[in-house]
Amino acid sequence: MADVQPTTPLAALSDAARTALGVAGPSVVRIGRAPGRGCGVVVAPDRVLTNAHNLRDGTTAVTFADGRSVQATVVGGDTDGDLVVLEVDTGEAPVLDWAPTLPEPGEVLFAVGRTGDGGDRVTFGIVSGRERAFRGPRGRRITGSLEHTAPLPRGSSGSPVVDGVGRLIGINTARLSEGFYLALPADAELRHRVEALVRGESVARLVLGVGLAPAEVARQLRASVGLADQPGLLVRTVEDGSAAARADLRVGDLITGATGRPVTTLDDLHAALDTVRASRRLDLQVIRGAEAIAVAIAFDEAAS
């Protein structure tokens, strides 16, 4: 009777890589004509998720694992969150399952992609960090990202990061220097957003309708007219008919807080706007000249 060799860690890793590719690979697509601009993943029948920055307009070619190349159109988008869902005939391509939990730092994961000529690609790495941030395609700060070390060539954004049994744990979105990559984590919040995009419900952010000067410029301008130094964002312009105009926010006002939290950067203001998307009311703390006042911004349905 032959001796049964124990499974080595390397053999177990190889088995997991093959499983990850075998399960997730058929769900991964190439975005754009060869060599392509990125990748995507089937998240529902006739629906493909990818990064918004992979598209130049509302249509694109999608190439599946079986070699089919089909024209797709955007059905739902979240440009600030760098996500779009495409409507396309997915044929026999399976929907990729979501992992029930996210991996912890140090855990192994696999990046699955599709090459420019339509072939499979799989690499492995570890979770090197969580709660990382980067800038989206329109400059807004995207937080909560999963940092990992699975190598990815250019043109891999939109591809999935999966666990050892091929379940979705993230969407590759940004590249850092020296071998680190960022993925949007496949958590409950992302799943909720993706399900809305699948239904054709594009995500829109609330817009104040103002032009702002950063804190350092605001300090200099206030000092030039003899006003006290105060951290905040200075209102330089107010658009006619905007939510800010209706609330009588004025040129020269200094926004120092929103929803009870300090505002010293544009990221602070964007974060506050995101928290009031449901209530559609933003309470600002403002310095007008030397006087501290409160300004309540009410957004109508057309303001997003």
Give the ranges of each region predicted by the language model.
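A structural signal for short beta-strand/turn segments enriched in small hydrophobics and glycine
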Residues: 46, 106-112, 161, 166, ...
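C-terminal cap/linker of serine protease catalytic domains
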Residues: 1-21, 115, 164, 168-230, ...
